[in-house]
């Protein structure tokens, strides 16, 4: 399943390359894509003809913590919980290189979401319209990949506002440049985190 490519993946989202100075001190934003096996997730990937049903955002200095939206709103996710809950879920982890300033902006955005967690809701209507390629931004309402794309757009200038508002999980695998750090079952994620090792030092890149 890891080798499947959806229609969304065929069109990469171009990102301006980092300058030489930025490359030397580049940081990284992590994007975790998951194909859950519950009924809702199966319906979503069937309707979108995609591979993944959920997306989260993290940072390379803490590859076990991610931020996203689910049916109950904004949430902070731990990789070990994913492993315990759905060990057979297929996952991919991408690293998107960025400058220190871009990472700082991304952290600031995520921090602002954490600070108003109780007022944030799930954007179910936005997700349905995104499946029809219709972008919809709603105040304090987001779905998982819309949130991730919004952070990447605002912090790093990736894609456009329209792209971010209608981005589905598979669309995040098309962001370039990026490194594929992990591609496999959730139950194998702990091996990548063992002994405090950096995930991207243990996996191939693209």
Predicted regions and their residues:
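Activation targets extended, charge/polar-rich intrinsically disordered C-terminal tails
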Residues: 4-9, 124-206
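Donor-binding and catalytic core of enzymes assembling or modifying cell-surface/extracellular glycoconjugates
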Residues: 10-54, 177-178, 182-206
């Amino acid at each position: 399943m890891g080798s499947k490519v959806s229609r969304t993946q065929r069109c990469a989202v171009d990102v301006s390359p980092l300058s030489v100075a930025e490359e030397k001190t580049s940081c990284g934003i992590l994007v975790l894509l998951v194909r859950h096996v519950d009924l809702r997730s199966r319906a979503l990937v069937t309707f979108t003809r995609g591979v993944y049903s959920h997306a989260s955002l993290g940072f390379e200095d803490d590859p076990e913590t991610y931020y996203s939206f689910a049916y109950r709103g904004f949430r902070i996710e731990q990789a070990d919980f994913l492993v315990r809950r759905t060990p057979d879920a297929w996952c991919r982890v991408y690293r998107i290189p960025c400058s220190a300033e871009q990472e700082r902006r991304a952290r600031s955005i995520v921090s602002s979401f954490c600070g108003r967690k109780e007022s944030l809701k799930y954007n179910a209507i936005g997700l349905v319209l995104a499946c029809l390629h219709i972008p919809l931004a709603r105040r304090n309402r987001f779905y998982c990949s819309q949130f991730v794309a919004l952070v990447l757009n605002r912090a790093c200038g990736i894609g456009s506002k329209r792209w971010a508002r209608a981005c589905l999980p598979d669309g995040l695998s098309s962001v370039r440049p990026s490194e594929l750090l992990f591609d496999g079952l959730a139950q194998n994620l702990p091996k990548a985190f063992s002994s405090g090792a950096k995930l991207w030092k243990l996996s191939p890149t693209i």
